[in-house]
Amino acid sequence: MPVVGKIIKIAGPVVVAEGMKGAQMYEVVKVGEEKLTGEIIQLHDDKAVIQVYEETSGIKPGEPVVGTGAPLSVELGPGMLRAMYDGIQRPLTAIEEKTGSIFIPRGVDVPALPRDIKWEFKPVVNEGDYVEEGDIIGTVDETPSIVHKILVPIGVKGKIVEIKEGKFTVEETVAVVETENGERKEITMMQKWPVRKPRPYKEKLPPEIPLITGQRVEDTFFTLAKGGTAAIPGPFGSGKTVTQHQLAKWSDADVVVYIGCGERGNEMTEVIEEFPHLEDIRTGNKLMDRTVLIANTSNMPVAAREASVYTGITIAEYFRDMGYGVLLTADSTSRWAEAMREISGRLEEMPGEEGYPAYLASRLAQFYERAGRVITLGKDNRQGFVCIVGAVSPPGGDFSEPVTSNTLRIVKVFWALDANLARRRHFPAINWLQSYSLYIDDVTEWWNTNTGPDWRQLRDEAMSLLQKEAELQEIVQLVGPDALPDRERVILEVARMLREDFLQQDAFDEVDTYCPPMKQYLMLKIIMTFYQEALKAVERGVEPAKILGVSVKQDIARMKYIPHDEFINVKSKEIMEKIKNELGSLN
């Protein structure tokens, strides 16, 4: 029997109900006559404190609260890709078709996965086979990019006594497993999983392979590993959202889960408009075919922001369990923290720093800890990963505020966006002096093997040049560049080339929007070769003006716009020769 209580207090999204004896923590309840979805977050005697995931205006004390007996869960199965959900996995397009309203009516209940679509199920096991949790029993071609693998649910193992082939809906039985104690378990193509509970795996693997994003500053200087975590903090207008869009478009993950958590609706609209037309460079299909969107914009109820983050990570873990690589981007975790602060205030909890609750750090850590590269459950030892990239919006660009500082304690890659760079039209506006990656040592072997054996050396030299430039800039502003020694004038010029010809990247140019690893390595090698040859010329007594006037500098400036294959196979060698000839002949 479901628990039935009644409302005694309402404070914004927080509702208190009495008569709830027998209810459980984090149980989903239906609140009021309109059956609004809520979740129990505190229990005292027979009173339950509920956070409601919909607008609570108009409900009144005395209305019923009915328990569902289940925690907040998501439906996992075919039909999630290309879909667009709100924070508690309600499909927005299906709601619009059902209600005819462009806004979500209160209390509307539409299943997350379509129940009327029949999917073509192809079995990969036979009757009599022994299966355990996480094994693949069949596949569904969900989109041209992704084959949806149907897994044995967690906690089920035994012998297949029946397996079907053909077209089925997500609720129809496709297999029957007889467990060791003789119980028959029916398996459908859909599973339910509580969002706050991480999905299990066999073993966590070290993050040794870089996630290639095609953005030079992120790949070469501040690498994110597959299964890693990154934060993108930055003030307004510094390019957080465009950076996340670039990651969602070009990173070499199989599936992208994009959570718009408390940000502007226009940004989600941009994703919906752009992604169906853009091509995935690895499969040649549309980007939307590998994307799940969770739209929880700033005008939607506050409590659902927290749910949207957990909904997104659970969907990501499910695709990871199939053996896919998943990139999860959350834009922005600051809005989720603000929602926690608001609800904590309504609960009259003791505030921590800047009014955020004392458990802010542990909640952030729980979320980021669900990233990782793993060996999944199942006999075939598949590997999958979840990368989490969280945008952080510190008010006034202050990186010492609690959300940013707590996030930095947890994540291993920090891409610091700089409003000054954005104003100078330097994009991506990632500040190379503030940013860092703690994965560099782990991924060096991959880069050295797949690009060139001197990759790490080139990267470290380039970084130290940029740091040297920052030190010299103070002197230049006092006395001007002409007062510097010749060697340091060369350093300033090469640092400028690194900034403008390597770090700057045009997201709207069809060639430069994505830069493959080999091209990144060769571009860096060319600039550093110019530096070495220029230093040799300085030692021979050549004036800096002559060195800085060579024509090869124009070729270096144009190299990012040369088509990748042509550059890697032909042009890079030509530019390298030209550098050695032009600078070598100066005397």
Curated annotation (Swiss-Prot):
CDD domains hit by this protein: ATP-synt_V_A-type_alpha_C, ATP-synt_V_A-type_alpha_N, V_A-ATPase_A
MF terms (GO), sorted A to Z: ATP binding; proton-transporting ATP synthase activity, rotational mechanism; proton-transporting ATPase activity, rotational mechanism
Keyword flag ATP-binding: yes
Topology in the lipid bilayer: Peripheral membrane protein
Main EC class the enzyme belongs to: translocase
Catalysis: reaction(s): ATP + H2O + 4 H(+)(in) = ADP + phosphate + 5 H(+)(out)
Regulation: ATP hydrolysis is inhibited by N',N'-dicyclohexylcarbodiimide.
GO BP field: proton motive force-driven plasma membrane ATP synthesis; proton transmembrane transport
Any one cellular-component term (Gene Ontology): plasma membrane
EC code: 7.1.2.2
Temperature dependence: Optimum temperature is 80 degrees Celsius.
Variation of activity with pH: Optimum pH is 6.0 for ATP hydrolysis.
Function, in words: Component of the A-type ATP synthase that produces ATP from ADP in the presence of a proton gradient across the membrane. The A chain is the catalytic subunit. Hydrolyzes ATP, GTP (86% of ATPase rate) and UTP (54% of ATPase rate), has very poor activity on CTP.
Protein name: A-type ATP synthase subunit A
Gene name of the record: atpA
